[in-house]
Amino acid sequence: MVLVQDLLHPSPATEAKQHKLKTLVQQPRSFFMDVKCQGCLNITTVFSHAQTAVTCDSCSTVLCTPTGGKAKLTEGCSFRRK
């Protein structure tokens, strides 16, 4: 009997489409990131699914705004995944 799908070695495309608990190895899809302010170039650590608006400590500009899921970065801000 030959299986159509290989259950032990799924392709990365099918793993990305599945729910986070239904994958072969469970792992969260959220992460922390360093966000660089566009005005003062100060770096702030932000959670990817932040539920409140995050502002810069020194110049108090808004770095990201919450949405239903992931936080949306303001235009001009760059980020690096930790």
UniProtKB/Swiss-Prot annotation:
Q: Which superkingdom heads the taxonomic lineage of this protein's source? A: Eukaryota
**Single Gene Ontology BP annotation:** ribosomal small subunit assembly
Q: Which Pfam families match?
A: Ribosomal_S27e
Q: Binding of Zn(2+): at which residues?
A: 37, 40, 56, 59
Query: PROSITE patterns per the record?
Result: RIBOSOMAL_S27E
Q: Which family does it belong to?
A: Belongs to the eukaryotic ribosomal protein eS27 family.
Task: Give its localization.
Answer: Cytoplasm
As to how many cofactors bind and how, the note says: Binds 1 zinc ion per subunit.
User: SUPFAM superfamilies, alphabetically?
Assistant: Zn-binding ribosomal proteins
Listed GO molecular functions? RNA binding; structural constituent of ribosome
Keywords linked to the UniProt accession: Cytoplasm, Ribonucleoprotein, Ribosomal protein, Zinc
Q: What does this protein do?
A: Component of the ribosome, a large ribonucleoprotein complex responsible for the synthesis of proteins in the cell. The small ribosomal subunit (SSU) binds messenger RNAs (mRNAs) and translates the encoded message by selecting cognate aminoacyl-transfer RNA (tRNA) molecules. The large subunit (LSU) contains the ribosomal catalytic site termed the peptidyl transferase center (PTC), which catalyzes the formation of peptide bonds, thereby polymerizing the amino acids delivered by tRNAs into a polypeptide chain.
Sorted alphabetically, the Gene Ontology cellular component annotations on this record are: cytosolic small ribosomal subunit
Q: What is its main location?
A: cytoplasm
Q: What is the designated name of this protein?
A: Small ribosomal subunit protein eS27
| Cofactors that this protein relies on | Zn(2+)
The entry describes its oligomerization and partners as:
Component of the small ribosomal subunit. Mature ribosomes consist of a small (40S) and a large (60S) subunit. The 40S subunit contains about 32 different proteins and 1 molecule of RNA (18S). The 60S subunit contains 45 different proteins and 3 molecules of RNA (25S, 5.8S and 5S).
- Source organism: Candida albicans (strain SC5314 / ATCC MYA-2876)
